[in-house]
């Protein structure tokens, strides 16, 4: 290391040139590194959508969902498989392990799907190649003129606007929500059908035969070629009415479709609806970003396309969700924090050194050390987000420590022997830096390497904190290298030959006067000091036990997601009425900019919502426009009080947080209970019982079992003997049920780019009542007339409208929100005890706690490994530096004392112990070790200068070298303070990271200044 320092001092031009090149490269990569709000913390998922028209959820579950789920469970790297069976379709979510490439996962899913035998008529497709963070932009089409109905707006969105947006880079899909889908409806009069002696198959054949096109290759006319084509696609309901079903051979008269049916254009059955600000139904769109894309660039592309799109007169776009605002605000918040921290550090250095020129090496060093890491971030595809910038923010105070000590030591040497020539200055700077460089290099290496265990985090917490760990490690590694290369050159070239002595600095004089009596008490009563140290170290663990736990602190995203669920199923029109009332109430809050609500699901596999679920996105105004004293917690509480509707249970959260939770565990609240079994009715009844038991716990704020709305079914059960008498099979009867009563699509009308289904079914007058269906007559292929009541039993029954499954078991979820003053661990422990005592589970049924609790337990287990691992790494590095077991253990044994400060400040601030806080604790371990190394280094230098009088050596190391120790601790401490005063987006996570570091560094400073001299007095002390 001495040779390297001498080389850079002898070649300052080359060192500065190389540094300038790296600065230029760093500035370029700063502008090229993508921006995002948070890292993509969602699991790799592949969604399978299976459609089987006319089938009920039970049939869908048994014949589609279960076979697919059971096959996917055996696919490699599969972590979980969840299924949703609903009328006409099934959605299966296949969740893969960390690090699985999404396109590899999609190919495996397709491979396993190819080996599954599914019923005829089932169509399969994969959902978008997107994650839970894919919903980046939403909009609504609003007709201000009153000219257009919802069907027109939905058609415009589906067949024009959607394709315009899809043409932009980075878009995986655009999902429509709300409005009415157009379809051709053929309502048959069964009496007219019978009167003409026609069968259903005659009608079906006529419909299909009237909607087709054909090509006749080419003909040659007058030496020119003409392509022959037959244009037979229907253009209007009148075209269908003219379709010939049968011709009378005697009279030649044709029986047309219009003679036996009413043909009209109508609206298909709605799966969902949307509302804007409580003013009425609108058509909306959800832009889904492709996995791995740059969200900010994608949203800019969408806005550009929308700005270039011509809309029908009187129709306008209204943005209902825009993540780019979150990204810009979050990154802006952290950039401001970095600037504040940097200024704070520079002010502290200038005050302690009491010279502007003396602090210039630090002023130059700091921005360079922050810019160069961007080169590696760009190469490693790490986005600029609140976590990656947070890693830099945590490093600012520490990364200048080596430079501070080097500058201060150079000051000390120049005070004793002011250089007269550049050569003398060279030797003084070289000697001063070489004296402290090895220990400083090791202390920075300790901070850098001790944070490496954070990379062992897995799951969501790993994806969240690895960017922070990368940037913190990169920043510290760059700072470590620059400290022994660039910093010596800056000190040599910038520091003046004559410096003001430490005694001339009033700050240092005050510090000496304050510290000297403390030092004398410490060395006079060393055993008392050591005893207090040990007691406080033990107390740290008692404080920890009193701090509640949580998985992750809330991240203010600048918008809210309100998700009420109906206890019982509601008709769509009633649900829309509730949606409008809720939205209009929420819009009255002065903090609210816009309210966009939807009931049911969007037309996309990423949305499994049922008609009993509402999702309302609430865009909030900037906090500076809020009422005085209003916080996000108070606002949610006020809103929740205003939107209490009978039969609806409210859930509140942030859009990204809730969507990630729903993907990773299926639970949309912080905590949930999954009841698993084989019978949907039994599983649901057990879930309701879990709700009742947990609601009785005083620690429970809300508990709500996700009841599946009951659908009424008309069950038509074939009488096989009767069918045989008429020469019919079950398939004949089922075909009539599906086509005439159910109205399955027979064909599609092609109108340019647009496609609309053609449905044949009984006119409403003949299917309104069960008796109508029972009396309904049809003609058999043999010409016999038979009624449904003759060949089938018809009865009314109830069954679930949706069946959920979790890893092959039928599942029902209980959503739980514990009260804010209890930790998740403690709540689950009590809840498990109460459930085991009061819930009677039949054989084959079980319950598990899920939601963020799953992530918390996994993260706690990992932390139980990586924190001891970090301590072991620190010990090894300390031993490599000191070559002394005693000194290495002295630093390690200081950890509990610093934790007293860390946990104490967390407790005072009312913060829960989250994974973010534990990551802060890991960072604190390295900081505490660094301060210990610096103190021991100066104590050893003092003992070396006074070999015959150790007490004087301790005095020299502690008191005479007070400035560098206080400077390093103060810069670290003060650099973190600005974080605690931030209130903008992204600040909540950073506060939980910084709080244990601030409390710990403060007590680490007390440790090195008070306890270390006492220990050295006991071990080495003699003299006066």
Question: What residues fall within each predicted segment?
Answer:
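Cytosolic juxtamembrane regions of multi-pass inner-membrane proteins
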Residues: 307, 312, 327-336, 353-354, ...
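Membrane-proximal extracytoplasmic
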Residues: 1-342, 384, 463, 624, ...
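Transmembrane alpha-helices and their membrane-interface boundaries in multi-pass membrane transporters
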Residues: 385, 395-411, 436-456, 464-503, ...
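C-terminal transmembrane helical bundles of large multi-pass transporters
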Residues: 323, 638, 642-1023
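Interfacial segments of transmembrane alpha-helices in multi-pass membrane proteins
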Residues: 2, 6-13, 328-385, 452, ...
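Signature of alpha-helical transmembrane segments and their immediate interfacial
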Residues: 1-35, 430, 434-436, 503-553, ...
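Interfacial helix-loop-helix hairpins and adjacent transmembrane helices
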Residues: 1-16, 415-431, 460, 466, ...
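Juxtamembrane segments of multi-pass membrane proteins
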Residues: 533-641, 678-699, 720
């Amino acid at each position: 290391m001495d040779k390297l320092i001498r080389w850079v001092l002898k070649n300052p031009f080359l060192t500065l040139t190389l540094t300038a090149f790296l600065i230029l490269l760093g500035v370029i990569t700063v502008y090229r590194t993508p921006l995002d709000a948070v890292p993509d913390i969602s699991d790799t998922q592949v969604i399978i959508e299976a459609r089987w028209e006319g089938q009920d959820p039970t049939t869908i579950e048994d014949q589609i969902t279960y076979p697919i789920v059971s096959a996917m469970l055996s696919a490699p790297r599969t972590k979980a498989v969840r299924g949703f069976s609903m009328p006409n379709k099934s959605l299966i979510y296949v969740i893969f392990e960390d690090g699985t490439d999404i396109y590899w996962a999609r190919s495996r899913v397709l491979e396993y799907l190819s080996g599954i035998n599914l019923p005829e008529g089932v169509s399969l497709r994969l959902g978008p190649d997107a994650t839970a963070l894919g919903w980046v932009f939403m909009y609504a089409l609003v007709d201000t003129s009153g000219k257009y109905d919802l069907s027109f707006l939905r058609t415009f969105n589906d067949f024009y606007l959607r394709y315009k947006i899809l043409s932009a880079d980075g878009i995986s899909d655009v999902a429509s929500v709300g409005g009415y889908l157009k379809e051709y409806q053929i309502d048959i009069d069964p009496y007219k059908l019978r009167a003409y002696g026609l069968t259903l198959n005659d009608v079906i054949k006529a419909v299909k035969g009237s909607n087709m096109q054909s090509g006749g290759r080419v003909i040659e006319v007058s030496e020119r070629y003409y392509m022959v084509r037959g244009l037979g696609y229907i253009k209007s309901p009148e075209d269908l009415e003219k379709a010939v079903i049968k011709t009378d051979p005697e009279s030649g008269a044709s029986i047309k479709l219009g003679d036996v049916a009413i043909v009209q254009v109508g609206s298909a059955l709605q799966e969902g609806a949307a509302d804007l600000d409580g003013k009425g139904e609108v058509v909306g769109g959800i832009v889904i970003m492709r996995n791995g894309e740059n969200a900010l660039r994608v949203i800019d592309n969408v806005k550009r396309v929308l700005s270039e799109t011509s809309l029908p007169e009187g129709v306008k776009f209204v943005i209902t969700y825009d993540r780019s605002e979150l990204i810009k605000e979050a990154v802006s918040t952290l950039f401001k924090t970095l600037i504040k921290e940097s200024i704070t550090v520079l002010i502290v250095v200038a005050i302690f050194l009491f010279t502007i020129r003396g602090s210039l090496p630090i002023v130059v060093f700091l921005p360079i050390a922050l810019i160069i890491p961007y080169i590696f971030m760009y190469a490693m595809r790490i986005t600029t987000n609140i976590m990656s910038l947070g890693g830099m923010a945590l490093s600012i105070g520490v990364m200048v420590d080596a430079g501070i000590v080097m500058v201060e030591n150079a000051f000390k040497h120049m005070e004793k022997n002011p250089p007269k020539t550049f050569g003398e200055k060279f030797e003084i700077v070289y000697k001063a830096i070489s004296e402290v460089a090895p220990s400083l290099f090791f202390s920075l290496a300790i901070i850098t390497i001790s944070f490496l265990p954070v990379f062992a985090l897995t799951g969501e917490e790993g994806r969240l904190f690895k960017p922070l760990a990368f940037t913190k490690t990169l920043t510290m590694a760059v700072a470590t290298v620059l400290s022994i290369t660039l910093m010596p050159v800056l000190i040599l070239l910038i520091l003046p030959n004559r410096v003001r002595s430490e005694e001339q600095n009033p700050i240092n004089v005050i510090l000496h006067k304050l510290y000297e009596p403390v030092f004398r008490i410490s060395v006079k009563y060393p055993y008392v000091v050591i005893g207090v140290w040990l007691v406080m170290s033990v107390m740290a663990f008692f404080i920890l036990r009193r701090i509640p736990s949580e998985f992750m602190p809330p991240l203010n995203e600048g918008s809210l997601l309100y998700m009420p669920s109906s206890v019982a199923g509601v008709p769509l029109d009633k649900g829309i009425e509730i949606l409008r009332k809720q939205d209009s109430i929420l819009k009255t809050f002065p903090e609210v900019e816009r309210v966009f609500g939807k009931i049911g699901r969007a037309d996309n596999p990423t949305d499994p919502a049922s008609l009993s679920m509402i999702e309302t996105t609430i865009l909030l105004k900037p906090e500076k426009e809020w009422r005085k004293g209003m916080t996000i917690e108070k606002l949610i509480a006020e809103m929740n009080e205003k939107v209490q509707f009978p039969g609806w249970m409210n859930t509140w959260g942030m859009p990204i947080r809730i969507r990630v939770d729903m993907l990773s565990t299926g639970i949309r609240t912080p905590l949930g209970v999954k009841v698993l079994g084989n019978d949907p009715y039994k599983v649901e009844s057990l879930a309701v019982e879990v709700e009742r038991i947990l609601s009785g716990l005083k620690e429970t704020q809300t508990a709500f079992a996700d009841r599946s709305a009951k659908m009424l079914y008309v069950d038509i059960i074939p009488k096989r003997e009767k069918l045989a008498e008429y020469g019919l099979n079950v398939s004949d009867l089922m075909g009539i049920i599906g086509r005439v009563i159910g109205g399955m699509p027979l064909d599609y009308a092609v109108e340019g780019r647009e496609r609309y289904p053609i449905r044949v079914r009984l006119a409403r007058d003949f299917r309104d009542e069960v008796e109508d269906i029972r009396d309904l007559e049809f003609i058999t292929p043999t010409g016999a007339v038979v009624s449904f009541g003759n060949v089938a039993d018809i009865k009314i029954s109830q069954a679930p409208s949706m069946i959920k499954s979790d890893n092959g078991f039928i599942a029902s979820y209980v959503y739980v929100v514990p009260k804010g003053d209890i930790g998740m661990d403690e709540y689950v422990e009590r809840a498990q005890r109460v459930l085991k005592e009061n819930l009677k589970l039949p054989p084959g049924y079980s319950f598990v706690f899920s939601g963020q609790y799953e992530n918390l337990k996994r993260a706690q287990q990992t932390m139980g490994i990586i924190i001891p691992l970090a301590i072991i790494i620190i010990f090894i590095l300390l031993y490599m530096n000191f070559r002394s077991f005693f000194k290495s253990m002295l630093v390690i044994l200081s950890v509990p004392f610093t934790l007293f400060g860390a946990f104490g400040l967390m407790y005072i601030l009312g913060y829960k112990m989250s994974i973010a806080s534990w990551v802060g604790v890991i960072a604190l371990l390295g900081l505490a070790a660094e301060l210990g190394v610096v103190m021991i280094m100066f104590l050893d230098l003092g003992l070396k200068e006074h070999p015959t009088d150790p007490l004087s050596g301790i005095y020299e190391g502690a008191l005479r070298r007070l400035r560098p120790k206080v400077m390093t601790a103060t810069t670290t401490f003060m650099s973190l303070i600005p974080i605690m005063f931030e209130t903008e987006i992204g600040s909540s996570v950073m506060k939980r990271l910084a709080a244990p570091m601030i409390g710990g560094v403060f007590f680490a400073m007390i440790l090195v200044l008070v306890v270390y001299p006492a220990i050295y007095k006991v071990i080495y002390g003699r003299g006066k």
